[in-house]
Structure formats: C-alpha cells, structure tokens
Amino acid sequence: MSIPTVKAKLLQGRKGLIVGIANDRSIAWGRARAFRALGAEIAVTYLNDKALPLV
C-alpha cells in the first residue's frame, strides 16, 4: 500500500512518538509512515524484540 504524495510538508519541524507498533499492518505503523511522509521526525516503540524484523 502506498501513501498518497502530499506536496506540503504539513508536519515539518514537528516531533512525534508512535507507540505499540506490532507489525507492518498495524495502525501505529501506518501512522508512522504517514507522519514521516508529511515531514515529522518520529520516535517509535514496538511490541518486543520478536517484532523488530517486522517493523
């Protein structure tokens, strides 16, 4: 699935924390991709070390 291209970096200069990424199909993962595409700097947490390869 691709994220639509947005010319404006609406979140440029903003910082965010995305918690609870479980895999590449989770809502948190989708938010992280979208926020990053809009220019935000993000930090993420994930379920556990077993989930790391999926993130």
Curated annotation (Swiss-Prot):
Entry keyword annotation includes Lipid biosynthesis: yes
Q: Which one of the record's GO molecular function terms can you name? A: enoyl-[acyl-carrier-protein] reductase (NADH) activity
Q: Which InterPro entries match?
A: NAD(P)-bd_dom_sf, SDR_fam
GO terms under biological process: fatty acid elongation
Q: Which family does it belong to?
A: Belongs to the short-chain dehydrogenases/reductases (SDR) family. FabI subfamily.
Q: What protein is this chain from?
A: Enoyl-[acyl-carrier-protein] reductase [NADH] FabI
Lineage per the UniProt record: Bacteria, Pseudomonadati, Pseudomonadota, Alphaproteobacteria, Hyphomicrobiales
- The entry's keywords: Fatty acid biosynthesis, Fatty acid metabolism, Lipid biosynthesis, Lipid metabolism, NAD, Oxidoreductase
User: Which pathway, metabolic or otherwise, does it act in?
Assistant: Lipid metabolism; fatty acid biosynthesis
Does the keyword field hold Nucleotidyltransferase? no
Assembly: Homotetramer.
- Could you tell me what this protein does? Catalyzes the reduction of a carbon-carbon double bond in an enoyl moiety that is covalently linked to an acyl carrier protein (ACP). Involved in the elongation cycle of fatty acid which are used in the lipid metabolism.
Enzyme Commission number(s) of this protein: 1.3.1.9
User: Can you state which reaction this protein catalyses?
Assistant: a 2,3-saturated acyl-[ACP] + NAD(+) = a (2E)-enoyl-[ACP] + NADH + H(+)
Q: Name one Pfam family in it.
A: adh_short_C2
Binding sites annotated in the UniProt record for NAD(+): G20, S26, I27
